[in-house]
């Protein structure tokens, strides 16, 4: 499955626009991560536990979007975007979305 943040591919022509596809996941903070994060705020620097959680969440949302595009018979997703939003205190939604298309050379 090809993906791009652009609205087209240089070497392909969009044959058919299938429509919006998306994937999301909602994650909550971990009490263990919170304790470590609290300590790190004292000394400063990156909080690798949260960085890892953010990366895993983005990957899961991306994977779910790709699965939806494949189920619809798409060859690619154009206009790929990521978003985050707070859902409840201590939790966040990670969203990946774009337009599913079929391609021709």
From Swiss-Prot:
Gene3D superfamilies: Hypothetical protein apc22750. Chain B
Pfam families: YbjQ_1
Disulfide bonding pattern of the chain: none
InterPro entries, sorted: UPF0145_dom_sf (IPR035439), UPF0145_YbjQ-like (IPR002765)
Superkingdom classification of source: Archaea
Family note: Belongs to the UPF0145 family.
Protein's UniProt name: UPF0145 protein Mevan_1624
């Amino acid at each position: 499955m090809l993906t791009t943040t652009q609205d087209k591919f240089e070497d392909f022509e969009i044959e058919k626009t299938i429509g919006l596809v998306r994937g999301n996941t909602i994650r909550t903070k971990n009490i263990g991560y919170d304790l470590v994060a609290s300590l790190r705020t004292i000394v400063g620097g990156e909080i690798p536990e949260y960085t890892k959680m953010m990366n895993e969440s983005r990957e899961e949302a991306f994977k779910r979007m790709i699965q939806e595009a494949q189920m619809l018979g798409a060859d690619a997703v154009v206009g790929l975007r990521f978003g985050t939003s707070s859902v409840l205190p201590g939790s966040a939604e990670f969203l990946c979305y774009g337009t599913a298309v079929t391609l021709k050379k």
